[in-house]
Amino acid sequence: MKSRLLSALLVLTLVTGATGALAATKGPRLYILDCGDIRPMDPTLFGLKKEEIAGDGSFVTPCYLVVHRKGTLIWDVGQVPDAQIPGDGTEVVVQDLLKARRKLVPQIEALGYHVSDIDFLAMSHYHLDHTANANLFAGSTWIVQQAEYDAMFGAREFAIRDSSSYDKLKDSKRITLKDADHDVFGDGTVVIKTAPGHTPGHQMLFLRLKNFGPLLLEGDLYHLPEERTLDRVPTFDFDAAMTRATRVKTEAFLKKTGAQMWIQHDPPTNAQLKKAPDYYD
């Protein structure tokens, strides 16, 4: 009897091992992962003058893992493919601009998850500093705006696009949205929000965290805080008027919900935040 009980417990452990941490969560958890840095860029690209910005024009590029009791979602997947990163701490620089020292997948695995455990993939937009490892998640359900899908795979050429990083998604399982929001797990705690302008189908991620409170990850709606305070739009946005309209709606949404907004690329913002294995819940 004792040996049967031990065998049963062993089987249960093997079956639930990958999902044990997920099942134990009472609300969503947000893990911030290190997906590199971007060398200083000319602030005029963002509608700003050098003397108008506080920093040197450099950026950070985080990735995010959301763990919900009903599943997992990866938000943005880096700027340098894991295959190009040695993984020994050596810095890799792509296009003399995008830097990375750490692979994405080992960071996920360190939290107890494998690529096959990621139920949903969502990226803010198709720019190459957000899509580098997208093909690794071709087995996940991809949440994308129709306009973004068309920009990614259509005949029209778009700047800052590297289709080789996401070409396996073309025929993958997906939830395609038509300029619409999407409640990922059906309880209002993890919501994809449409936010066009920077790209045709740019989107953001809204979270209702039990302890931290409501939070908005804004993709590239802003890159620098000064874009927000001085009302400047990057010169390379797909549609500046659309960006401005999205910003107005977003500011109203923040006021209505009381949500914090993290500017994903902003180094000072990122420096203050807890990184995986710590999390926000």
How would you describe each model-predicted region?
Residues 25, 94-106, 206, 211-281:
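Cap/insert and terminal regions of metallo-dependent hydrolase folds
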Residues 35-36, 77-80, 126, 147, ...:
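Active-site metal-binding loops of divalent metal-dependent hydrolases
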Residues 136-138:
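Short, conserved loop/helix-junction motifs that constitute active-site signature segments
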Residues 7-17:
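Bacterial N-terminal signal peptides
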Residues 1-4:
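Positively charged n-region of N-terminal signal peptides that target proteins for export
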Residues 20-129, 145-194, 212-219, 242-258, ...:
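Metallo-beta-lactamase
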